[in-house]
From Swiss-Prot:
PROSITE patterns cross-referenced by the UniProt entry: HD, KH_TYPE_1
Superkingdom classification of source: Bacteria
Membrane-protein topology: Single-pass membrane protein
EC number: 3.1.-.-
UniProt key word Cell membrane: yes
An example molecular function term from Gene Ontology annotations: RNA binding
Organism per entry: Clostridium perfringens (strain 13 / Type A)
InterPro entries: HD/PDEase_dom, HD_domain, HDIG_dom, KH_dom, KH_dom_type_1, KH_dom_type_1_sf, Ribonuclease_Y, RNase_Y_N
The gene coding this protein: rny
Protein name: Ribonuclease Y
Keyword line: Cell membrane, Endonuclease, Hydrolase, Membrane, Nuclease, RNA-binding, Transmembrane, Transmembrane helix
Length: 511
């Protein structure tokens, strides 16, 4: 057993030696191989480095050659440019030399002419002195006296010629102005087609049958009295078949009465309470119509941006007349005419139209305003923020204030043209209406008066007083005072009945 172990150990030793010998040999071969490869790599690197060095040297030589060539070219260009500049300098120097010679020659010529001119001036002065002395000797006048006479004569001739020229120009200007104004006014009138004429103070309401007349009158006339009292309108019921005539100088009252009566006829129930209700509705309808008419007028004339109160005043002009002419239609017509004339003259068309439309708004206010309607209209326009030009045109269209713009003159001319149109106005009707207005103005001037209506063509005035401010004795005294004031201030045919009405109502409700 020991022998076997020894043999194994020996075998292992032999095998280990063989392996060691083989490993050593392999390592030696590997080292030699690596050394050989390293030597080859080093030689290859040396060859590549040598090649790169040669290429770099060649590139550097080429770059140096290129830079030298560029420098030579730039040097040649600079040399050529310097040569061209030198040639130009030489040419300019030669040109300056020639100009200098020419200037010297011209200076010599000028000096010679100056000497000649000086000699001529001396000769002229000598001749002038000799002639003046000769003239003074012949005329026995000094030079100052002769100059004064000559200037006076020239002055007289110029003044005469100027006066003749001014007169001729003024005549031509007037002729041209008259001709141009006629053309402008004719053109404006032709382009403005107005179809409205004067209005009357009555309105006819159609009835379905004659039996309706009795219902309108009512028992013992209470219905017709109530309607007349509430509206201030005369109801004329005569033999005219199927018709009732409403008579009042105030178109607003007449319109309220017409609407209320037509509503009552359609409704069929006619008694004092129903009449009061229908009159209140009619008043609201008329107020709405006033607003719509004002807006329609601004739309027709192209005038925008008006204050709502101004529009309301415009609408009220529908129910105002001037010598029988509807004031709203008249204002629209004036707006058109003023705008057309402004366009012909190259003025502000919008300003002329606006002022023309608003020129009579002073007629739309109630009796609490005093003064000419033009001045009142100007104050209202200023109050509602209209421009100063519009305010002046309104206030000045009847000459109450001085006109400050040409558009104001056009508004005045358009107002006159519209009023002078055939069929537009009636003088007698206006005088009649003014008398009725004066009657109502006198009545309402007393404290405690609520409403007053001039009826029966001015032969009667009904005055409603406030019962809490005027008692029965006060009503009698007021009637006497009004009679006295009317007799002092008005001229009228016949007599006028003063009817002061004091009414007290007590209303309560059963529940």
């Amino acid at each position: 057993m020991v022998v076997g172990i020894l043999i194994g150990i020996i075998i292992l030793g032999v095998v280990g030696f063989i392996q060691y010998t083989l490993i050593q040999k392999a390592s030696k071969n590997r080292v030699e191989s690596l050394e050989k490869e390293a030597s080859l790599t080093l030689e290859e690197a040396k060859r590549e480095a040598e090649s790169t060095k040669k290429e770099a040297i060649l590139e550097a030589k080429e770059e140096v050659h290129k830079l030298r060539a560029d420098l030579d070219k730039e040097t040649r260009d600079r040399r050529n440019e310097i040569q061209r500049f030198e040639r130009r300098l030489i040419q300019r120097e030669e040109s300056l030399d020639k100009k200098g010679e020419m200037l010297e020659k011209r200076e010599d010529s000028i000096n010679k002419k100056s000497i000649e001119i000086q000699e001529l001036e001396e000769r002229v002065q000598n001749l002038y002195g000799e002639q003046r002395a000769e003239l003074e000797r012949i005329s026995n006048l000094s030079s100052e006296d002769a100059r004064t006479l000559l200037l006076d004569e020239v002055r007289r001739e110029i003044k005469h010629e100027s006066a003749m020229l001014i007169k001729e120009l003024e005549t031509k200007a007037k002729e041209e102005a008259d001709k141009k104004s006629r053309e402008i006014i004719t053109t404006a009138i032709q382009r403005c087609a107005a179809d409205h004429v004067s209005e009357t103070t009555v309105h006819v309401v159609a009835l379905p049958n004659d039996e309706m007349k009795g219902r309108i009158i009512g028992r013992e006339g209470r219905n017709i009295r109530t309607l007349e009292t509430l509206t201030g309108v005369d109801l004329i019921i005569d033999d005219t078949p199927e018709a009732v005539i409403l008579s009042s100088f105030d178109p607003i009252r007449r319109e309220v009465a017409r609407i209320a009566l037509e509503k009552l006829i359609v409704d069929g129930r006619i008694h004092p309470a129903r009449i009061e209700e229908m009159v209140e509705r009619a008043i609201k309808d008329v107020e709405n119509d006033i607003k719509e008419e004002g807006e329609q007028a601004t739309f027709e004339t192209g005038v925008h941006g008006l204050h709502p109160e101004i529009i309301k005043l415009l609408g009220r002009l529908k129910y105002r007349t001037s010598y029988g002419q509807n004031v709203l239609k008249h204002s629209i017509e004036v707006s058109y005419l003023a705008g057309l004339m402004a366009s012909e003259l190259g003025l502000d068309v919008n300003l002329a139209r606006r002022a023309g439309l608003l020129h009579d708004i002073g007629k739309g206010v109630d009796q609490e305003y005093e003064g000419p309607h033009a001045v009142i209209g100007g104050e209202l326009a200023k109050k509602y923020h209209e421009s100063p030009a519009v305010v002046n045109a309104i206030a000045a269209h009847h000459g109450d204030t001085e006109m400050q713009t040409l558009e104001a003159v056009l508004v005045q001319a358009a107002d006159a043209i519209s009023a002078a149109r055939p069929g537009a106005r009636r003088e007698t009707l206006e005088a009649y209406i003014k008398r009725l207005e004066k009657l109502e103005e006198i009545a309402t001037s007393y404290e405690g008066v609520e409403k007053s209506y001039a009826i029966q063509a001015g032969r009667e005035i009904r005055i409603m007083v406030k019962p809490d401010q005027v008692d029965d004795a006060g009503a009698i005294e007021m009637a006497r005072n009004i009679v006295k004031k009317i007799e002092e201030q008005l001229e009228y045919p016949g007599q006028i009945k003063i009817n002061v009405i004091r009414e007290t109502r007590a209303v309560d409700y059963a529940k």
